[in-house]
């Protein structure tokens, strides 16, 4: 075949045939060996095509699949050829016309595959009953055994039939087994490619669909001769069983292997479909938009597909890849339109041809319209331009899980141990009544020190064989039950519940009869207290050093010893801060401060120059020392690792805790360098030093006292007028400012409290205007109800 010569003279003769008088050309016209004789198939039938080649032979899907011209004229065609070398005359080829591609080229390709060329059948020559209405033969039979039965070429498309192998069929072959061919059984996959720019018309769809194939018995066909036998698949005569019918658009033909591919014009393919049995086409016919000018039609069925296998076609010098048998899934089959198959009729539902993906179009449509206007009866991307926005009615808010799970015998009220909510009894709860288990969030890897003090009180540690297994966090009301609101007792008298672990869970059990209107207050069991490292009884005071004190007076005395041991030099410290044990040889040139390293001196000097490169990400504050920034960040994160064992207050710095502990002892260890006055807190000493260092220009008209600010003078004038509007509800003390009353309430526990209240901590080193020098604190006498505005006046009264 490589030595084939297509002479120009022969080409001119071939091109002289007109479209209306097209002559099919065989291999004898081209100087090739004559192909085996074949008989023309009857005109009625289903158009089929040669099976596709594998990707190894051609870059196109098939070297034997044809895209026939859309009409009679000069429209182009596409054809894939095997990767073989052919001797052809040099270009150009003015003699090649469309008739060459419709008649000559199919014959060449068919000869290469040792298969007969396609037979051309015009659909108008077929009646509704399937018989030939008009048989036209324009070519003498002597020229080629394969004759065209119509004078009009293909215009609209093809329907392809692929060869498949069915396990249940016998291995029969149309050709003799001469070593060049393999036995094939036949299955049919129909695919209609219609080159129309508008949906297929649904007119005239009440006709019968027939499929004619060509089969032959292997034992009856000698070498060089072939017989033809039509097979029909319709809705009346054929009953296909599930084991012999394929799946996904594959319909097997009962008989021997398919020999002759038939190509038919499909202008009105829908007019040939009617009354298809559900056993043949049990699902539907689907259309998928392939391009703007073509539609692909696939027939799908729900029969078993397991019996189909791949098959290979062999020929001398030509090898076809195995024909893969694959099903048409529902997602692939359901495209932009479908044909519903019913027992009455087969109707086609047209759809618009689109190039874009249908799924993306649906998503775009879903996101485009968001609001439906019932008055306009349409959707809008936003509010209706005519009727405005719609009215939304929100759901009724529901309470958290913790509050909804509260038993009916209990209620939630303000706790007596703090500002949080506590659990109170609505009726009598008998002794040995168990509540639980405690429900919360489990954490298997958690650092308790990273939690705030409030969160630590809601952390329950669960141990297994003495090893911490996990923790139960009870901070989220939506994740916990009502037991998260039960508070811890401060002493033995308040305790009425015992908390203990069991099987990895926490339970509360009443230790006494609890009458109504009493708060549930728990403390840990003896074993559980030992596991978590707390005292066995709530009234035992535990020091940081590990010493347990049975009474508050004993614990206070023990705490005083710690203060003297840890702060020996703070009694005579200057306003610049405490002295250090290490030698401070790096002195500042702008102030008398000294440092133990040049890096600390450099950071300190940046403060004098106003350089603060370290800024806080949460607020606008900046610092020259990065350590001060780290300390400041604890304010935003709420991390307070230093906790007071007496009042459960927590602090971000150890120095603040030590300063706070002085409040409980009542000792004044900080002495002013300018006078002999003593103070408990360093902040109070710092404010007092301003009296000696800063000049006061605002003078009181009644007592000639000087103040730094006008607001300080106004507060001082209230003392002359006797206005002490801020009175403690627990005792008889009254204060000039709300700040001093708030500070007093934090330490006031008894009506006869003697010491002035002190704030727990001032993170920024400034308590505000109320705490600046000149703001005076009133003190009350224990023996009488007299109130005084200064410590000196109170001492004189005593």
Swiss-Prot record:
Transmembrane segments: none
Entry EC number(s): 2.1.1.-
Gene Ontology cellular component annotations, sorted alphabetically: cytoplasm; cytosol; histone methyltransferase complex; nucleoplasm; nucleus
UniProt-annotated stretches for the region Disordered: 750-798
GO molecular function terms listed in the Swiss-Prot or TrEMBL record: death receptor binding; DNA-binding transcription activator activity, RNA polymerase II-specific; DNA-binding transcription factor activity, RNA polymerase II-specific; histone methyltransferase binding; methyltransferase activity; RNA polymerase II cis-regulatory region sequence-specific DNA binding; sequence-specific double-stranded DNA binding; zinc ion binding
Domain SET, chain residue ranges per copy: 408-525
GO biological process terms, semicolon-separated: cellular response to growth factor stimulus; cellular response to nutrient; methylation; negative regulation of cell growth; negative regulation of gene expression; positive regulation of transcription by RNA polymerase II; regulation of gene expression; regulation of neural precursor cell proliferation
Keyword Disulfide bond among UniProt keywords: no
Key words, A-Z: DNA-binding, Metal-binding, Methyltransferase, Nucleus, Repeat, S-adenosyl-L-methionine, Transcription, Transcription regulation, Transferase, Zinc, Zinc-finger
Cross-referenced PROSITE patterns: SET, ZINC_FINGER_C2H2_1, ZINC_FINGER_C2H2_2
Zinc finger (C2H2-type): 586-608, 614-636, 642-664, 670-692, 698-720, 726-747
Source species, domain of life: Eukaryota
UniProt subcellular location: Nucleus
Enzyme type, top EC level: transferase
Main location per the UniProt record: nucleus
Record InterPro entries: PRDM4 (IPR017124), PRDM4_PR/SET (IPR044404), PRDM4_Znf (IPR041493), SET_dom (IPR001214), SET_dom_sf (IPR046341), Zinc_finger (IPR050331), Znf_C2H2_sf (IPR036236), Znf_C2H2_type (IPR013087)
Biased composition (Acidic residues): 758-769
Similarity remark: Belongs to the class V-like SAM-binding methyltransferase superfamily.
Main function: May function as a transcription factor involved in cell differentiation.
Name of the featured protein: PR domain zinc finger protein 4
Organism: Rattus norvegicus (Rat)
Lineage start: Eukaryota, Metazoa, Chordata, Craniata, Vertebrata
